[in-house]
Regions:
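Glycan-processing catalytic domains of CAZymes
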Residues: 4, 10-230
């Protein structure tokens, strides 16, 4: 599968095409390459759409470091194109490690549905997540309940980029629990302490974002991610 910039259960290989075998794992595409513009960008999204929702179930949509004030026509097209091939769109929202006023975050949840359509936005990617204290956990719990009740049971993905506690584990459907270089991932990986991350039954709820992956590291990174329940 030739996809660049993908989270696979999770792998991000920069701008190099990913060609490893990922059986029983999946990818999430961060939509950081602008949807239209140049030949390279068009080729990127053509590759994503050819792969389809069977191999790339989700794409993270980030029109303006978040939803922005008005709909972006290029992202409207991208969102529709993703939807047409079975790729679910996740709206990108920062929480600033749960210090951003939660009403602002909730307003962004609503704004994605207003601007891009409740039937086209399938969930949310909450970035800059902390799991370090009771406040952070309570914040995430409130946000999780809001999405499920107000937005219509949309998917919640949270990106702490590091290991989480068992206390916060119930408050996202998927967690990104590692965001490191391939070198660190393969040589200096810190083992998780939570029961959640150490349970293979939770592999479908755990993703790892590994950057600076060279082709000769693909198989080793994939093997390691499987062993680490991602």
């Amino acid at each position: 599968m030739e996809i660049a910039n993908a989270l696979v259960g999770n792998i991000n290989a920069g701008d190099k095409p990913f060609t490893g075998t990922v059986s029983a794992q999946s990818m999430i595409i961060p939509a950081y390459k602008y949807p239209t513009g140049g030949w390279e960008t068009d080729t990127y999204w053509d590759s994503v759409h050819k792969a389809g929702g069977g191999k790339v179930p989700y794409a993270v949509i980030n029109p303006a470091s978040g939803v922005g004030e008005k709909a972006n026509s290029d992202y409207v097209k991208l969102i529709n194109d993703n939807d047409a091939v079975g790729i679910k769109n996740l709206g990108y929202i920062r929480t600033v490690y749960q210090t951003r006023p939660i009403e602002e975050v909730k307003a962004e949840v609503d704004k994605y549905l207003e601007l891009y359509g409740k039937d086209k936005i399938h969930g949310y990617f909450f970035d800059e997540i902390s799991a370090l204290n009771n406040h952070a956990t309570a914040y995430m719990a409130e946000l999780y309940r809001y999405v499920k009740e107000k937005a219509g049971n949309k998917l919640v993905m949270a990106n702490p980029g590091t290991h989480i506690t068992d206390a916060i584990a119930p408050y996202a459907d998927i967690f990104v629990t590692s965001e490191v270089s391939a070198k660190t991932y393969l040589n200096n990986y810190e083992q998780p302490k939570s029961a959640f991350e150490n349970d293979p039954a939770n592999a479908h709820r755990i993703m790892h974002m590994i950057h600076d992956v060279t082709p000769d590291q693909y198989d080793a990174v994939i093997k390691a991610s499987r062993e680490r329940n991602a």
